[in-house]
């Protein structure tokens, strides 16, 4: 799988370099540099075709749109992953707290119901396979 990404990365780097060189030629265009411009434009088209071929190899990869927002804002896309993990961790802690609270509530409820309705709770515990009723 990594070789697919390496291949795409290589093609993208070549494409970006080609665009950089094309920008240099265009910014200081001379009629004598027309042949070089045409060559760079052909390389540009070939580069787009190569990138399109890579796209076919990576058709099953999905990227969250928020990653592109990070890139558009000039932020590191790896920060998106870090922030997602931090949000997931915080949500996990929150849910764990709720679960612990509900377990404590269940324990206290069973304890109090056992005081008020000892026979019914003994039957309940027997059905649930929990503590056996006192003899």
From Swiss-Prot:
Signal peptide: none annotated. It is found in: Nucleus. Pfam families: Med10. Keywords: Activator, Nucleus, Transcription, Transcription regulation. GO terms for cellular component: mediator complex. GO terms for biological process: atrioventricular canal development; cardiac jelly development; regulation of transcription by RNA polymerase II. One of its GO terms (molecular function) is transcription coregulator activity. Component of the Mediator complex, a coactivator involved in the regulated transcription of nearly all RNA polymerase II-dependent genes. Mediator functions as a bridge to convey information from gene-specific regulatory proteins to the basal RNA polymerase II transcription machinery. Mediator is recruited to promoters by direct interactions with regulatory proteins and serves as a scaffold for the assembly of a functional preinitiation complex with RNA polymerase II and the general transcription factors. Belongs to the Mediator complex subunit 10 family. Component of the Mediator complex. This is Mediator of RNA polymerase II transcription subunit 10. It comes from Xenopus tropicalis.
